[in-house]
Amino acid sequence: VEKMSKVLNFTRKDFEREQNLGKGLILVDFSANWCGPCKMLEKVLNNLSGRVDYRIARINVDEESELASELKIKSLPSMMILKDGEIIERLTGFMEDDEIEKIVKKVRKRESNTNE
């Protein structure tokens, strides 16, 4: 059975659409095929995507190098958390799923406090 939530492959167009129209939380992973830690993170995110209630997307920085430099992605892997199209958190380096979940929880808490 195909899990509903799998990691989405994003292009620049998808990312811009997300910034303009995005609702809710999305974790965007910037990675490259030649990057070892990215490959490890890919597995973690694939695993995570099946059991979290937010979307996860991946952007290949070799295919979207212009976007990556505009967003000042300096090292790989890098992740961003967007809420309603706004970048609210940037993460760098490989992380295990529990670390990622902890950060998402923290970000959600922080965001819900700022909106009241």
Where do the language-model regions lie?
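Structural micro-motif
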Residues: 71-80
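Short pre-active-site segment immediately N-terminal to redox-active cysteine/selenocysteine motifs
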Residues: 24, 30-34, 75
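Short loop/turn elements that flank and shape the SAM/SAH-binding pocket of Class I
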Residues: 13-17, 64-67, 98
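The canonical Cys-X-X-Cys-His
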Residues: 35-38, 79
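Short, Lys/Arg-enriched N-terminal segments with co-localized hydrophobic residues
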Residues: 1-3
